[in-house]
Amino acid sequence: MVTTNAPIITLRDVRFTYDGGATWALDGVSLDIRRGERICLTGPNGSGKSTLSRVIAGLVAPDEGYVVLSGNVVFDESGAHADEYRTARCGIGAVFQHPEDQIVTTVTEDDVAFGPENLAIEHDEIGLRISGSLDAVDMSDYRASDPTRMSGGQQQRIAIAGMLAMDSDVLVLDEPTAMLDPQGRADIMRVLDELQDRGTTIILVTHHADELEQDRKSVV
C-alpha cells in the first residue's frame, strides 16, 4: 500500500441538506483522505453515507463547508467552483448503488469505453483498457452483449469495469458488491486490493463486516 502524508481529499465542517435545512444529511463532517488510503464509510441506513460519497466524488456540492478534491478547492465560503469541480472529476471514478443508472449504451464494450473517450484517451489505449477492465470483473465473454438486458449483478460488474477503464487516482464505490454472490464480492475486493497496492485512493461504502479490515480506516 502506497500512502503519502498530504491529503488528496479534505472536508471541513461540511453540511448538506435535501429539504432546505429542516434536516441535515451531513452536519459538520470533517475528513482527510490521503493518497493510497482505503476509507470505508459504514453506518445505518439514512446516516448520510451515500450523500458523503457523492460529495467526495464531486457529484454534488454541499450547502456549507470547505472541500478539496484531488488538490482542487471545489467549495469554500464563496460557494462552488465549477472549473475546479470539472478538473477534479477527471481523476475520480465512481460506482453507485443502482448500476442500471450508469449503463449508457446497448453494447458492453461501448459502455466501458464511455469514460475513457470523454477523457480523450487514444483509441488503441481505450481498447486495451476495455479488455483489461472486463477481464478484471470476469465479463470478457459479454463484450458484445447488451448490458441493458443483463442481471443486476452483471450490470454492477459492467459499471465497475467502466470505472476501472478510466484509470482514476481516486475511486468512490457505494455498495459496489451489493448484488454479487460471495465469490463475486471476493473477486472485486481482490481488484481493489491490487489498485490500492498501486497507490489508488479508495472510498468504499459498505455494510459487509469482512470489508472492514484492520488496515483500512473506517468512518462511522
What are the residue ranges of the model-derived segments?
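The feature captures the beta-strand-to-loop junction immediately N-terminal to the Walker
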Residues: T42-P44
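Conserved ABC transporter NBD signature motif
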Residues: G65-E77, A88
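Conserved ABC ATPase "signature" region
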Residues: D124-Y142
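Conserved ABC ATPase signature
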Residues: D146-M150, Q154
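Helix-to-loop junction immediately C-terminal to a conserved catalytic motif
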Residues: A57
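Helix N-cap at the start of a conserved alpha-helix in ABC-type nucleotide-binding domains
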Residues: P182-G184
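Catalytic Walker B motif of ABC-type/P-loop ATPase nucleotide-binding domains
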Residues: L171-D174
